[in-house]
Swiss-Prot record:
Subunit structure: Homodimer.
PROSITE patterns from the UniProt entry: HTH_ARAC_FAMILY_1, HTH_ARAC_FAMILY_2
Keyword Signal on entry: no
The keyword Transcription regulation belongs to this UniProt entry's keyword annotation: yes
Protein's name in the database: HTH-type transcriptional regulator GadX
Induction remarks: Expression can be activated by RpoS and repressed by CRP, H-NS and GadW, depending on the conditions.
Cross-referenced Pfam families: HTH_18
Keywords, alphabetical: Activator, DNA-binding, Repressor, Transcription, Transcription regulation
InterPro entries given in the database record: Homeodomain-like_sf (IPR009057), HTH_AraC (IPR018060), HTH_AraC-typ_CS (IPR018062), Tscrpt_reg_AraC-type_HTH (IPR020449)
Portion annotated as DNA-binding: 162-183, 209-232
Length: 274
């Protein structure tokens, strides 16, 4: 028997299928049923290929993608330990996710693909009103995660401790206390979220420094540059230049390798002709 606290599982029934709960109860499913469940409440003793276990880390990455209203649901709310969504068509990606999940030595690209496919499977349940309460019951996100989720949903907003507390349905003093217990503060998390978003906008999207500053909630470009330098140890412009240089070096290296492969193939061909 396998029981994983703080994790979830997704099961897919291609034919009639029976799940055994830890309390001994049997749950019956028809072919095409996709199941999302608290892994700690399921006995898994056979047909593991029908399951995809979703770790706490993966769930924590999925949670910030949701709207902050989701966090206003009380995690202690009593909900079912599993949900069922009937799919009218086969889910071809499920088998791929299951295979990737059983491989302990995934390449980086495979890890990213597995995560993306798991997110796609989780999204099937988003319209179920019990999905988010169940997710929160299982994950029980810490206050850092909940605050960052609120901030990231509107990164440019003029966030204050009181405003964030209001979004989380608690008093500012209680929020401050809970963050202190996790050895952080709302201002520290606000800076972390904005700096991480700034890096994405600079490196991936190539925004101008002024546009990045405004997009991240800074009215003063000079102050944004000051915060960025304190956080990353260099100015945004310096970071842009270094990123461009690294990209250029990688392109050059790739070009050299490609040329080497070409000439190597050409010489081999000449050798054959001789």
């Amino acid at each position: 028997m396998q029981s994983l606290h703080g994790n979830c599982l997704i099961a897919y029934a291609r034919h009639k299928y029976i799940l055994t709960m830890v309390n001994g109860e049997y749950r019956y499913f028809n072919g095409g049923d996709l199941v999302f469940a608290d892994a700690s409440q399921i006995r898994v003793d056979k047909c593991v290929e029908n399951f995809v276990f979703v770790s706490r880390d993966t769930l924590s990455l999925f949670l910030p993608m949701l709207k902050e209203e989701a966090l206003n649901l009380h995690a202690h709310k009593k909900v079912s330990s599993l949900l069922v969504h009937h799919c009218s068509r086969d889910i071809p990606v499920f088998q791929e996710v299951a295979q990737l999940s059983q491989n302990k030595n995934l390449r980086y690209a495979e890890m990213l693909r597995k995560r993306a496919l798991i997110f796609a499977l989780l999204s099937v349940f988003l319209e179920d009103e019990h999905f988010i309460p169940l997710l929160l019951n299982v994950l029980q996100p810490n206050m850092r995660t909940r605050v960052c989720t609120v901030i990231n949903n509107n990164i440019a907003h003029e966030w204050t401790l009181a405003r964030i507390a209001s979004e989380l349905l608690m008093s500012p003093s209680l929020l401050k206390k809970k963050l202190r217990e996790e050895e952080t503060s709302y201002s520290q998390l606000l800076t972390e979220c904005r700096m991480q978003r700034a890096l994405q906008l600079i490196v991936i999207h190539g925004f101008s420094i002024k546009r990045v500053a405004v997009s991240c909630g800074y009215h003063s470009v000079s102050y944004f540059i000051y915060v960025f330098r304190n956080y990353y140890g260099m100015t945004p412009t310096e970071y842009q230049e270094r990123s461009a240089q690294r990209l250029s070096n990688r392109d050059s290296a790739a070009s050299i390798v490609a040329q080497g492969n070409f000439y190597g193939t050409d010489r081999s061909a000449e050798g054959i002709r001789l």
